[in-house]
Amino acid sequence: MGNNKKDSNSNYPFASPEGEAGVQLVPKLDTPKMYKVILLNDDYTPMDFVVLVLRRFFAKTEEQATEIMLDVHKKGAGVAGVFSLEIAEMKVMQVNQFAQLNQYPLKSTLEEEA
């Protein structure tokens, strides 16, 4: 089978394939799942507040924020951004707390990106 000796030229205690001194095998890492943060429409939150949320928490330009806000208004929901799970969860929490603090019913949620 393989040569299980340490490569004398390496500081790493990894076994090398037969006869290939210095070759280190790197495990393939899976790409992390990404999650969409979605803003949900309601009948009370003003459009300018939704734009403010998109600019403040998602670093959107005025034009980008307005486009997403119109999706929320017309389609019932709009994607604010796509993030790793931890970042998406934090964004959802920030948006929901900010809306509640300002006494608006705006809600956000996350959904795994397909």
UniProtKB/Swiss-Prot annotation:
<comment type="subunit">
    <text>Binds to the N-terminal domain of the chaperone ClpA.</text>
</comment>
<dbReference type="InterPro" id="IPR014719">
    <property type="entry name" value="Ribosomal_bL12_C/ClpS-like"/>
</dbReference>
<dbReference type="GO" id="GO:0030163">
    <property type="term" value="P:protein catabolic process"/>
</dbReference>
<protein>
    <recommendedName>
        <fullName>ATP-dependent Clp protease adapter protein ClpS</fullName>
    </recommendedName>
</protein>
<dbReference type="InterPro" id="IPR003769">
    <property type="entry name" value="ClpS_core"/>
</dbReference>
<dbReference type="Pfam" id="PF02617">
    <property type="entry name" value="ClpS"/>
</dbReference>
<dbReference type="InterPro" id="IPR022935">
    <property type="entry name" value="ClpS"/>
</dbReference>
<dbReference type="GO" id="GO:0006508">
    <property type="term" value="P:proteolysis"/>
</dbReference>
<comment type="function">
    <text>Involved in the modulation of the specificity of the ClpAP-mediated ATP-dependent protein degradation.</text>
</comment>
<comment type="similarity">
    <text>Belongs to the ClpS family.</text>
</comment>
